[in-house]
């Protein structure tokens, strides 16, 4: 059963839910940025500079958290986010490598590029 913050245990991580979370290009961008950082790096949600309303950003982070891809903890008035690298690699070997290797397309990396 997920903890009170909605983090599932590694055994509860569902491949379908993980793939659904990764289907969105903005969420993949968050995972790629966290995967590129040193192990255990924690960032605030605002540090990702996603071009969307705060409520939409919150939704995207909730989807990633409930899928088990990230761990979030409150720190004052900020919420720190870190990648659950060891748990993901243990449950779905190679998945993070595939996400990290993706080259974002201009239309998904920057919605304004298509205009």
Set out the residue ranges of the language-model regions:
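A general structural signal for short secondary-structure boundary/capping elements
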Residues: 65-67, 78-81, 97-99
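Amphipathic alpha-helical dimerization/coiled-coil segments
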Residues: 1-16, 32-37, 84-115
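Short beta-strand "wing" residues that participate in macromolecule-binding interfaces
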Residues: 72
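N-terminal helix-turn-helix DNA-binding core of bacterial DNA-binding proteins
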Residues: 17-21, 25-53, 75-87
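Canonical helix-turn-helix DNA-binding module
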Residues: 46-69
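Generic signature of intrinsically disordered, low-complexity, basic-rich segments
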Residues: 17, 51, 63, 109-110
